[in-house]
Amino acid sequence: DMPKIPDLDFDFEVKRSARRKTLCLQIRDGHVQVVVPTRTPDRQINALVKKHKDWVNKKLGEQLARPKAAPKAYVAGERFGYLGAEHRLKIVEGAHWPLERVGQELVVTLPARLQGAARCSKVKERLHEWYLLAALEQFQERTDIYSRRLGVTPTLVQVKSYKRRWGSCSTGGEISYNWRLVIGPAEVMDYVVAHEVSHMLEHNHSPAFWRIVEDLMPNYREQQAWLNKFGGMLAI
């Protein structure tokens, strides 16, 4: 039960309760939930969310903003994370070639004529392309593993450039992940995968949902805490 509001850059879940007498808007672990009396009309729920959307965006933003990664210059020798390990950026002169990961190095090949700001821009572009592909590959593999454990089959696995969320699962079984997660530890990626795959059985954040997550990953709270504290560091 998730009403749609145009131009809203976060999703929210509606939980209806016969015991609830008033409307309540809450944020837990980066997820927005509105708890309302059973017969509350959607228009009243939407009005509440619209009224407090700036507050919600602020709170969600705070979770992704602490601490922040230092801006990159995209020059040789800089360090970039991949699956929690630092990789040194190496720039080689030659014909255009896709970025390659060689050991603990990310190797970009560019023409010698490309210098200054144009070179840095191209390096950033190559890095972004590589991270998107690497993230998709990792998430497809990990989603397959966790889906099999639950006996579910997602209809689509994709990566996106989310600003305020780490993943989502539609009621149709389409799972999307924030590609930046591939920068951090593999265990944190696994937590988000376990979280989203669990939504295929429980499309909410009820106690039953969290029990499924815990069955898949008993120490999920550790990964959750890491993400809440260091999520803002996942940037290139």
Segments predicted by a language model, with ranges:
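Active-site-proximal or metal-binding-adjacent scaffold patches in catalytic folds
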Residues: D1-D190, M200-I236
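Walker B catalytic acidic pair
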Residues: E196
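Walker B beta-strand of ABC/ABC-like P-loop ATPase nucleotide-binding domains
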Residues: V193
